[in-house]
Amino acid sequence: MGQKVHPHGIRLGIVKPWSSTWFANTQDFADNLEGDFKVRKFLNKELANASVSRITIERPAKSIRVTIHTARPGIVIGKKGEDVEKLRNAVSKIAGVPAQINIAEVKKPELDAKLVADSIASQLERRVMFRRAMKRAVQSAMRLGAKGIKVEVSGRLGGAEIARSEWYREGRVPLHTLRADIDYNTAEAHTTYGVIGVKVWIFKGEILGGMAAVAQSEQQPADKPKKAPRGKGRK
């Protein structure tokens, strides 16, 4: 029976960057790794309602820099930055070094696999029909420019006695093409019948040039709005 490799894991260093970017000696590596795990666990728990997509961690010169990618930056920052300051103090206490927290906004949450999976899971918990939730997510992603999307739900769908899996796909989702930019994530819906698992694959196009092209695209600022061409006036 064929099994699927994790789409991010197989593409690390090819078209996908690491979530933690730091170097440590042998004696510090385990402590840093545990610190990253605790920081992510704490932030995901504290910001459960803030639509957090991913958390990236850097460790420059005995400090920690955490970047929170979220679709709702206002909730993370809080009134006059109070909430983000509390988070900074808590992260600094967990990691044991001075902390800096950056907030990055996710411009199109419909094209983010984590946010799509969380959205479907929350709809299932609110007793929305699973087929309707899947179709709505797929249509939103395709409308906003995704090249392809696949959604799979597994469990006691609709309260059935026997658990099963159902999936829905539109467009292309090439899992074997290493240069394909595939965003993948999972979520769980805790219903009265039990847990329903949600998996989402989103194909955003192919990346030519490897990690250099990825780094260049991340460094580029957002495109400035283009000015309308001036009219020639009366002749």
From Swiss-Prot:
GO molecular function: mRNA binding; rRNA binding; structural constituent of ribosome
Native organism: Haemophilus influenzae (strain PittEE)
Gene Ontology annotations of biological process type: translation
Disulfide bond annotation, renumbered to this chain: none
GO cellular component: cytosolic small ribosomal subunit
CDD domains per record: KH-II_30S_S3
Described function: Binds the lower part of the 30S subunit head. Binds mRNA in the 70S ribosome, positioning it for translation.
Entry keywords, A to Z: Ribonucleoprotein, Ribosomal protein, RNA-binding, rRNA-binding
Name of protein: Small ribosomal subunit protein uS3
Classification via Pfam families: KH_2 (PF07650), Ribosomal_S3_C (PF00189)
Subunit structure: Part of the 30S ribosomal subunit. Forms a tight complex with proteins S10 and S14.
Domain KH type-2: 39-107
PANTHER family linked to this entry: 30S/40S RIBOSOMAL PROTEIN S3, SMALL RIBOSOMAL SUBUNIT PROTEIN US3C
Family listed: Belongs to the universal ribosomal protein uS3 family.
HAMAP family the record matches: Ribosomal_uS3_B (MF_01309_B)
UniProt superkingdom: Bacteria
Segments for region (Disordered): 215-235
